[in-house]
A protein has these predicted regions:
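Active-site-proximal, structured, solvent-exposed surfaces of multi-pass membrane proteins
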Residues: 466-596
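Extracytoplasmic
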Residues: 9, 97, 260-512, 516-520, ...
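Membrane-embedded transmembrane-helix bundle of lipid-linked glycan/lipid transferases
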Residues: 1-283, 288-301, 387-390, 406-408, ...
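Short solvent-exposed coil/turn linkers within tandem alpha-helical repeat scaffolds
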Residues: 651-660, 688-697, 725-739
């Protein structure tokens, strides 16, 4: 809760730095309670409910960003204090990347100052560059390894304006609107702090619309805009307040009214605070929790634990209680420290959906199946998960009826199941030889592999990750991650392994054969006893041992050391005594003159780029659905030629969105109905490749076969229909594919009879 307690203080300091006289900064500390106790959301960040839900790091960064925005306003005028500003911004960024953007973006306001453009530009560059250097030990490795993370840039679907403007902010919203109008209509030096805050709101709104295009969740920017609205309302209140004799008295009355309003708006926060901070031990369910964790106790070396996702676990203190199983039981679960962003998260959430009545498909852009523990079992085997905790009747019934599982603890409504006949190894030789797949989107294709039951025993690697000198190790290749050659690996291999947090060692009787390691791949894993570590599906490691003993060690690599070096440079800059007038106005004069001459062009170009990019992002967010619906209405009227341009436009604008997938599918469907099977074939294939997890995929595979049949490519058509029946046996389109195969066999029989 440090961030929550910090915000009133940083608000006070920020308002003082903005030039507001007493009692406005003190009133700002009280007004910050309007934001902190906002119960309108519990996951956007910054407010107390979000902190209680686990967004404590964002809360800390939020307070530091507020402080930075205020101090920047004061210090940029003198050109001094850049070291402490850089440190504050770096701490905000290390707490949360969105906090860094929230703090840094308002600084663009000072680049509109005609007289001080060059000086302000140099000052901002000095502060921001130093902050980036200070963050280097974390930032450089993050950027370099971002390809091994999972983006959670989901788009928030607002259902009401109350979400953006909850009840607790109603009194400040009209005040902020009036102040915004005032500072725009009456620009003056006295209104400059208000214009700065208003600009900060605008630039934060722009960041909101551009966030998803750079892989950030847009909703994280809303809290900062809400807080800035409070500051803008304070700007209006400050105008008459500082002119009133004994201003402390009306300020005290306003503070009391604010506290009363906050108190009247609070409902669940106090009980949530008590629930969170009394701990697991004070809950009535704690003895049950102890029995479950004792039944699962082991060590890191042991196979993993899986658990059904369910809100019913809230009775223990949190529905995410089992993320603490490594601490409670000593054994690993499917998740690591970071739940949503590691490279394995799309696979974990897919698997969780298979073994949970209420799965949580939080990673955007992926398909999540219905509960099916039978299909989940081979995927649990893949992750070396031997024990599973279940709570809902449907999942328990499925596991009870599955001979591969045995119930080992019955503690209604909880039950623990033990996987029988699992070898329990993290290192294993796969049953089939690995296949090198030609792919430009390995994450998507590896996920397609993971969702295909028939492919799970054949590990795949991305061709572009295999150096030319190593390709002889992968004689089998494929262009599809799901249609793979199955070449069995002969030989019985004995493997002894030892795992620790930063090291994996194993001894094998089968050097030269591929060894599949059920631990997440990351570039920091270095190997001894093999030439290199390969990224293999789903996101595991694969090695070809050169000798019986192999050791993999997680250690720093070059980019990590470069990041540490950058941070040391940043620290040196901050700790080195400043020379007089180091970044003051007028140095260097020649550069300033050139920059000031270029200012109109630079500012106009930057504004145009930002506005065009934002307009494009808004268009991509808003337009695909209505454009698609125009095409759909034409499609319903069988006006296929008129529908196709709308579908194409929805596909181009929509990116990886659902309207784009629908546009792709119905464009192909329109072409097929127009008697153009060749063009339709390419359209259906485009959907399966671009949107491999979409609900239209199975139907598209079926129509691929249909197009091939119409084109007379009967052998390929049979293969396509057969793929549907094997890969999606429970789907209704598998039944239609079976009918097509029967028709093709009958036609072939007739041709043979006539021949």
């Amino acid at each position: 809760m440090v961030g929550s307690f910090l915000l009133p203080l940083t608000t006070t300091l920020a308002l003082r730095a903005l030039g507001y006289a007493f009692p406005v900064p003190a009133l700002g500390a009280v007004a910050s309670l309007l934001f902190l106790f906002n119960e309108g959301n519990s996951m956007w960040g910054g407010n107390i409910p979000s902190t209680l839900a686990g967004e404590f790091s964002h809360s800390l960064g939020f307070g530091l960003a507020v402080l930075f925005v205020g101090l920047l306003y004061r210090r940029i005028e003198s050109g001094r204090g850049w070291r402490s500003l850089a440190a504050i911004l770096a701490l905000a960024g290390l707490s949360h990347p969105v906090a860094f953007i929230n703090g840094a973006a308002p600084g663009l306001f000072f680049l509109f100052d005609r007289q001080r453009f060059a000086a302000n530009l140099r000052y901002l560059a000095t502060v921001y560059l130093t902050a980036v250097l200070l963050m280097g030990f974390w930032l450089l490795p993050l950027v370099a390894k971002l390809g091994y993370a999972t983006s959670i840039n989901w788009t928030w679907n607002f259902t009401s304006w109350h979400e953006l403007l909850p009840r607790i902010l109603w009194p400040v919203a009209p005040l902020a609107a009036l102040d915004a109008l005032w500072v725009v209509v009456r620009p003056s030096p006295a209104n400059r702090p208000g214009r700065y805050v208003l600009f900060s709101i605008v630039i934060t709104a722009i960041a909101f619309y551009d966030a998803t295009s750079v892989g950030l969740p847009e909703i994280r920017f809303v809290p900062f805009a809400q807080f800035l609205v409070i500051l803008l309302a304070l700007d209006l209140v400050a105008r008459p307040l500082v002119r009133v004799p004994a201003a402390a008295l009306p300020a005290l009355a306003l503070a009391a009214a604010t506290v009363a309003w906050v108190q009247s708006s609070i409902t669940y926060v106090p009980s949530w605070i008590k629930w969170n901070y009394e701990g697991f031990e004070r809950k009535d369910t704690y003895p049950t929790l102890q029995r479950i964790t004792e039944a699962l106790r082991g060590k890191l070396q042991d196979p993993r634990i899986a658990y059904e996702n369910s809100p019913l676990y809230e009775r223990f203190g949190s529905m995410r209680v089992w993320e603490g199983l490594p601490r409670f039981s000593g054994r690993a679960t499917l998740e690591g420290l970071l739940l949503q962003t590691p490279v394995t998260s799309p696979f974990i959430y897919y698997l969780q959906s298979l073994i949970s009545t209420q799965g949580t498909g939080v990673i955007p852009g992926y398909f999540y199946p219905s509960v099916d523990p039978k299909r989940g079992t081979p995927r649990l085997d893949l992750f070396n998960a031997r024990d599973m905790l279940a709570i809902t009747p449907g999942v328990k019934k499925a596991l009870d009826e599955d001979p591969r599982w045995q119930r080992t603890l019955d503690l209604p409504p909880y039950a623990i199941y033990h996987r029988k006949d699992l070898d329990g190894h993290y290192v294993r030789v796969p049953h089939y030889r690995p296949v090198m797949v030609e792919t430009s989107r390995w994450k998507r294709d590896f996920h397609r592999w993971f969702t295909t039951d028939a492919a799970l025993e054949v590990p795949i690697v991305a061709a572009d990750s295999v150096p030319a000198a190593e390709r002889t190790r992968f004689p089998l290749t494929s262009r599809s991650p799901t249609e793979l050659p199955h070449v069995r690996l002969d030989g019985h291999c004995d493997i002894e392994e030892h795992l620790s947090h930063l090291q994996i060692e194993f001894t094998t009787t089968c050097p030269g054969l591929p060894h599949w390691i059920a631990v997440s791949y990351f570039p920091n894993w270095q190997v001894e006893g093999a030439s290199r570590v390969y990224l293999a599906s789903p996101a595991f490691m694969l090695v070809f041992p050169d000798r019986p003993h192999v050791r993999l060690t997680y250690r720093r690599i070059t980019v990590d050391w470069l990041g540490i070096g950058a941070s040391l440079v940043g620290l040196a800059l901050c700790l080195t005594p400043a020379r007089r007038r180091q970044v003051e106005v007028g140095e260097p004069a020649a550069l300033d003159r050139r920059l000031n001459a270029l200012r109109p062009y630079l500012v106009v170009a930057a504004v145009l780029v930002v506005l065009l990019a934002t307009a494009g992002n808004v268009a991509r967010a808003v337009l695909p659905r209505p454009i698609y619906m125009r095409g759909w209405r034409a499609f319903e009227k069988q006006e296929y030629a008129r529908a196709i341009p709308y579908f194409e436009m929805a596909t181009r604008l929509g990116g990886n969105s659902y309207p784009a997938a629908e546009g792709t599918f119905f464009r192909a469907a329109s072409l097929l109905r127009m008697g153009k099977p060749a063009a339709a074939l390419e359209g259906y294939r485009a959907l399966t490749e671009r949107f491999p997890d979409n609900v239209w995929v199975v139907e598209s595979y079926y129509h691929v076969g249909l197009c091939l049949r119409q084109l007379g490519r009967l052998r390929e058509a049979k293969a396509a229909f057969r793929y549907v029946t094997l890969s999606y046996p429970e789907n209704r389109w598998a039944g239609f594919a079976t009918d097509q195969l029967k028709q093709l066999r009958e036609e072939a029989r007739v041709r043979r009879t006539r021949g």
